[in-house]
Amino acid sequence: MDARQFHEEAALFVDALCELKALGPLRVLLPHWPMSMGLTDEWVELARALKTVRVQHAGQIPEELMDRLASLQHAAESAVNGQ
């Protein structure tokens, strides 16, 4: 997933969380999304936030969004690792 695809998918994911009124996951993600400059430290924080949402708030997110969340987390971690 390239950066453009990542940003499109992340925007759709955040929009879906807003529609669900999933305040817990939004509280974790919104301080890190959208990124201001896309620097490595921002990618690290976003990857960490995505992981936190996946682990701590899974019960508030439907299965199809969990798949998107896992994909976003993997892509953010890959961006940090330069893959």
Region annotations inferred by a language model:
Residues 1-83:
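C-terminal-biased regions
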